[in-house]
Every structure is written in structure tokens, then in C-alpha cells.
């Protein structure tokens, strides 16, 4: 079978992406150069892993939760990092339906410390802080 993987720039199952070289979002802060994403099956870290993070820089008028990633962090294929605060869903209102943009609440920054290992298809929720060497399966 000579056809490339559908919708994927990755040519082989063992390819990976050094995220410090590819991430452009000003709200993602990467410490060091050795954190990587096992990019098999999809279109890269920023597009497929980080969800609901605005690509405009945070300002005093419009603060945006930040994603901080340490050095030597390993991200497995198809893992997900949820961002975007409460995504307009307010459990303290009569309905969790996102009726109004004023219903947004920030969740706080998400921090993934040095040496963490995020397994394939694992999910990290917004506002979480993972300590050094944490493993998420």
C-alpha cells in the first residue's frame, strides 16, 4: 500500500514533533527544546492536542488562560489538553447551555512541569497543574 496516511503529514508511526519548533500560539509557553509530541495519526500538536485556546495574545482587558509546558515532556498520539475556561457552561445557572458570552469564567493556567509523560488519548482538563515527572495514562 503506497498511499500516504489520510490527512496526515506524518509518514511513519515513529515520527515525532519537537513542539518548541512548531507551536506559534502566544498563549502556549514552552520551556526548553526537548518536549515532543508523538504525531502519528493526526496533524500536529497545536492543531490536534490543544483545544479551545484562543490564538490571540492575552491582554488586561481580555485575559486568556495560558498553557505552560516544561522541558522533556512526552505527549502521546491523540492526547488532548482542554483549555478555554468553562467554555461558557455555567453549572450554577438554571441551565448549562451557553446562552451568553458573559457566562465565561477562566479556569486558570494549565501547567505541565518538566519530565511529564502524557499517554496516548489521555485528557488533561483546563486549569490543572501537573507536577514534575507526573504520568497521565
Indicate residue ranges for each PLM-predicted region.
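DNA-contacting interfaces and partner/effector-binding or oligomerization modules
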Residues: 21-22, 30-34, 38-41
Amino acid at each position: 500500500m503506497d498511499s500516504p496516511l489520510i490527512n496526515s503529514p506524518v509518514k511513519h508511526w515513529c515520527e515525532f514533533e519537537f513542539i518548541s519548533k512548531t507551536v506559534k500560539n502566544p498563549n502556549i509557553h514552552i520551556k526548553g527544546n526537548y518536549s515532543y509530541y508523538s504525531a502519528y495519526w493526526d496533524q500536529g500538536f497545536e492543531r490536534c492536542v490543544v483545544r479551545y485556546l484562543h490564538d490571540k495574545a492575552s491582554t488586561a482587558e481580555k485575559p486568556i488562560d495560558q498553557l505552560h509546558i516544561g522541558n522533556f515532556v512526552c505527549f502521546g498520539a491523540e492526547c488532548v489538553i482542554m483549555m478555554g475556561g468553562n467554555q461558557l457552561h455555567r453549572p450554577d445557572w438554571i441551565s448549562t447551555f451557553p446562552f451568553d458570552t458573559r457566562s465565561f469564567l477562566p479556569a486558570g493556567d494549565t501547567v505541565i512541569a518538566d519530565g511529564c509523560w502524557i499517554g496516548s488519548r489521555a485528557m488533561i482538563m483546563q486549569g490543572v497543574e501537573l507536577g514534575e515527572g507526573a504520568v497521565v495514562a
